[in-house]
């Protein structure tokens, strides 16, 4: 028996997720969503494409919580405000599947080999979060945009490139199970990369 379930004191069910992300501009997100729909048909995938407004590159996952931890939000916002980097170009030119839970493999748009701007932002933000005591152990950073989840796994293959200038990053509050994102903060990158 787990101590957390002893005497009816079960762990609260997570309802809220916090993460930092880069989101493509609306026109690029529309094109990515269109590609997801086309590839879903061509590759005979059954998973439902992610909503256009949810397409993003995760930089740092802060965790899943039962309720919104305001102290963590405040600390994360302060750490993000200390990031000082120029804007940069992001390029995504392949699709493929990651390993996931059985029957639920992420089918993703993958960053080009020269994703140094995203890696730099990931590293800089990670250092600020660590300095604030908010660092989490995370897997290696692989820039990607999740298009859908599916039982099939697809080998990496090239697609027509998607490019945009990354001018900001955001802190997102995801309401788990409700397919709802709330942007809690935006931090601009300096112009003229």
Residue ranges, per PLM feature:
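Histidine-dependent nucleotide/RNA phosphoesterase domain, centered on the 2H-phosphoesterase fold
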Residues: 1-193
């Amino acid at each position: 028996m787990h101590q957390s379930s002893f005497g009816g004191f079960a762990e609260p069910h997570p309802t809220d997720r916090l993460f930092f992300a880069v989101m493509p501009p609306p026109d690029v997100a529309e094109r990515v969503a269109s590609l997801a729909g086309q590839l879903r048909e061509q590759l005979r995938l059954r998973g439902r494409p992610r909503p256009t407004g949810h397409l993003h590159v995760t930089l740092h996952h802060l965790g899943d919580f039962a309720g919104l931890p305001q102290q963590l939000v405040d600390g994360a916002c302060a750490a993000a405000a200390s990031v000082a980097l120029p804007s940069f170009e992001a390029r995504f030119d392949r699709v493929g599947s990651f390993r996931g839970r059985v029957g639920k493999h992420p089918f993703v748009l993958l960053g080009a080999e020269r994703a140094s701007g995203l890696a730099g932002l990931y590293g800089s933000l990670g250092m600020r979060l660590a300095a604030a005591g908010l660092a989490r152990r995370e897997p290696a950073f692989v820039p990607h945009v999740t298009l859908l989840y599916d039982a099939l796994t697809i080998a990496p293959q090239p697609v027509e490139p998607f490019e945009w200038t990354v001018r900001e990053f955001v802190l997102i509050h995801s309401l788990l199970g409700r397919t709802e994102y709330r942007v809690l903060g935006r931090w601009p990158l300096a112009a003229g990369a």
